[in-house]
């Protein structure tokens, strides 16, 4: 719900309100109409975890990944909420695996969740933008890192009157 920021930290609430106040009603309506889940035969794309709202959460631990996998309907799922590029793999009867990765041929008969990282607000000690390139033919995923003008981005944050901690996070990558 684009009008409900009651369940977020104060810093996030400030940014949420700032952004909301700058969007036109038609833009808010369009954002509200977007699907919460994009699902194909082969993969799904979500914001946080596959757990139903409001229980969805950051997938940052094996316990949280295990909960996520209870609701994942495809072998492969991409998510972004944690802002950390990571890989979680689940095969029934085996220990759940979580790790960082750069290049990976995705295994068959295993559920895989890939955290795609972030463009801005990184949380993995690396200020560069992160994205995942998924090759459907090779069934592979590659982590891409791109430098951008962090100082200019920090200046825009501060000039907008947003919390200074948001600007410093860009340099620190946390």
Predicted segments with their positions:
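Active-site neighborhood of phospho(di)ester-bond hydrolases with catalytic His/Asp-centered motifs
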Residues: 46, 76-81, 113-117
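Acidic, His/Gly-rich catalytic cores of divalent-metal-dependent hydrolytic chemistry
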Residues: 92-174
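Short, structured patches in soluble enzyme cores that scaffold and shape functional sites
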Residues: 47-50, 82, 145-147
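Active-site environment of divalent metal-dependent phosphoester hydrolases
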Residues: 1, 51-53, 78-90, 105, ...
